[in-house]
Amino acid sequence: MATKNITVRNIPLADIQPSTLNPRKTFDQDSLNELAESIKENGLVQPITLRKTPKGSEKHFEIVCGERRYRASILAGLDNIQAVVKDLDDKKAFAAMIIENLQRKDVDPMEEAAAFSKLFTDGTMKVKEIAKMLGKSQSYVISRINLANIIPQFVELMND
């Protein structure tokens, strides 16, 4: 199997913006503070993944994977962050975001539901494809898509 050489670059934090595609919307401040302390003490263990922004954008790069590490690096007072820059369209970037976020144990069910629903309702992927890509059962994916379609007022109550 062929492997690609991956180049890790040092990118100024000021040149990076979070992605509006990121299904993760909540970040625990205490956890970010702990990660910032760890980064100060030990450095960044894993580089973040970026993609270039379209010409004319205020920032040069958009976060694909690693927004939590990005936020913690800012809290740690760093100027630069180690990153891998990939050439990804919206579909591939969104899929990478979902895959990375599902590796966490504390995935918010509503964020996961919104991400699955977006892939499905945009016509981007079928349930079977989402399940295969994420290593989940089709019934699990369907239940999350259904969760995303519950009454908006109920979602608001759950998030409070």
Protein language model annotation of sequence segments:
Residues 71-160:
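Amphipathic, charge-rich alpha-helical segments that serve as recognition/docking helices
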Residues 1-86, 97, 103:
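Short, charged/polar connector segments at secondary-structure boundaries
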